Amino acid sequence: MAKLQLNRIKAVLAEKSVSSKDLAQQLKRTESTVSRWSTNEVQPSVETLYEIAKFLDVDIRELLVSTKLP
C-alpha cells in the first residue's frame, strides 16, 4: 500500500534550495526529526508547520498542498 504524503516539506525545501540540516538548525531540532517529517514518517505540529513556513518564506498551505499550476 502506498504511503500517504501528508506534507510537502521535502519538496518545498528542494524548491527553496534549503537543506534539511539548515531547517533543523533553525528550528533547534535534530536532522533525524526533520528527515522523519520530510518522508512523512511523522507529522510536525501545526505550530511547527508555521515555523517552517516562516523560515522558508512560504504560505503554510504550500507545506500541505501544492498551489502551483501544472
Protein language model regions, located:
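Alpha-helical residues within the helix-turn-helix
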Residues: 14, 25, 54
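Recognition helix of helix-turn-helix/homeodomain-like DNA-binding domains
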Residues: 29-44
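DNA major-groove recognition helix of helix-turn-helix/homeodomain DNA-binding modules
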Residues: 47-62
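Key DNA-contact positions within bacterial/archaeal DNA-binding proteins
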Residues: 21, 32, 61
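DNA major-groove recognition helix of helix-turn-helix
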Residues: 38, 56, 64-67
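A short, Lys/Arg-rich alpha-helix, primarily the initiator
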Residues: 1-19
